[in-house]
Swiss-Prot record:
This is CTP synthase. It comes from Ralstonia pickettii (strain 12J). One of its GO terms (biological process) is pyrimidine nucleobase biosynthetic process. Pathway: Pyrimidine metabolism; CTP biosynthesis via de novo pathway; CTP from UDP: step 2/2. CTP binds at S13, D151, I152, E153, K191, T192, K193, P194, T195, Q196, K227. InterPro entries: Class_I_gatase-like, CTP_synthase, CTP_synthase_N, GATASE, GATase1_CTP_Synthase, P-loop_NTPase. PANTHER family: CTP SYNTHASE (PTHR11550), CTP SYNTHASE-RELATED (PTHR11550:SF0). The lineage of its organism: Bacteria, Pseudomonadati, Pseudomonadota, Betaproteobacteria, Burkholderiales. ATP binds at S14, L15, G16, K17, G18, I19, D71. Residues 1-270 are annotated as: Amidoligase domain. The keyword Transmembrane helix does not apply. GO terms for cellular component: cytosol.
Amino acid sequence: MTKFVFVTGGVVSSLGKGIAAASLAAILESRGLKVTLLKLDPYINVDPGTMSPFQHGEVFVTEDGAETDLDLGHYERFVSAKMRKANNFTTGQIYESVIRKERRGEYLGKTVQVIPHITNEIQAFIERGAAASHDGKADVAIVEIGGTVGDIESLPFLEAARQMSLRLGRNQVAFAHLTLVPFIASAGELKTKPTQHSVQKLREIGVQPTALLCRADRPIPDDERAKISLFANMPQDAVISVWDVDTIYKIPQMLNEQGLDRIICEELRIEAPPADLSVWAHMVHTLENPQHEITIGMVGKYVDLTESYKSLIEALRHAGLHTSTRVNIEYIDSEELESGHTQVLDTLDAILVPGGFGKRGTEGKIRAIQYAREKGVPYLGICLGMQLAVIEFARHLAGMKDANSTEFNDETEHPVVALITEWLDRDGRVEKRSADSDLGGTMRLGSQRVPVQSGTKAAAIYGAEVNERHRHRYEVNNHYVPQLEKAGMIISARTPSENLPEMMELPASMHPWFVGVQFHPEFTSTPRDGHPLFKAYVEAALAHQQNTQRAAA
């Protein structure tokens, strides 16, 4: 029977509940347990697919095509289990499900209320999500509840967790509460009062934390931990100090050294071997002792909020980890390049244009792509970054001066990137798509296997087949592919049924390393295994750096 650990937060959001949950999962997995994770989001949106990156950060796409919270990316990077649609749900999905049941008459004429109907539905979703991994035989499911204790939106989720604890009985459910212990510079001391109030609020709901994770910018002294334990009504060793570190991959060791996994296993009556975190120790050692250093320019319009590119940033770090390279990322606002001033690109070892939506900043990205192509700087374009590379190539090398995407100009003379107006949905039914279609859930989503053309860079990286995740509406227009290929572009991977371009590259005679991909490879990169595409990209950046230094000598 699966046991549950609920991870809650207090005082403020963005303390790192997702990292804490993922780190605990990694420790338990290293003890030989089968672990899965769930994220419960209290907002009313059905999913984050239509939310602004400035509001929500990155949208993480699962193998089965769900648009989910970015914390699921942390989960996949820290544990071996793959997340699915069932591993993330929102208030919107809960209410949608309950209302459908009410309309079908499943409640037999009863008044539908938050308690018990909404809370029962939340519990059903939690148990369904826990069964989605390990063939339904997970030993532990770690359930992160978004928001903070005291939020109106979070109350039904916390009540559902309390009810699950009561229903399942002793030693079946544990609670880890993450809270803030701020350092007040003017007083020169850490303040525990916000944490005391947060735990008090949680206990009012009927939940007593098993462990308390106290976030601070420095280690919390024992006397402060003793004070917290007294007011929180829990043993001092269950008050865990979680301080700021330079890499999130140190967190599993930090929590393990303070006995968090021991506390949880004792509460749940789980017997398991000691944790073996040697892989994480080796990872941290490699990160702290690189042999090389490069700078990659990431050109986008969400650069002021790097959470928008969380998986991509981590994928680049993973590639650095597997090439013993410190990867520095310089974030470049694409709108600042639209005036033609590209001097900021001169010191870069490689250029990357990530995925995105909308017209704003696209001409600046195209200038960066042109710079990379003409100067021989390694280039990687992801999703929109590939589409813009096709537009740049069409304009300057294929004789289509006004080439564009219909996303930006629906009257363009050469729509080299266009909307696919007819797709098969997940059930195999024809689904019409147009510019007027709903935005939510109407993209090509999830993993797809695609054959790769032999003798290409893509084949050297991936082998005969690529299996990556997608999140996009627009595609490279097949009508223009012959003209692009005649001008020198190589389409190195195509979808088997629609024959749509999935990867493009330039031959070595035109550029040393220029690759665009329609999918999102960052979603499958992990610190343990890295990713072949990002590894090849970092190696190309190192080669470019060495050639530049050799030429300058």
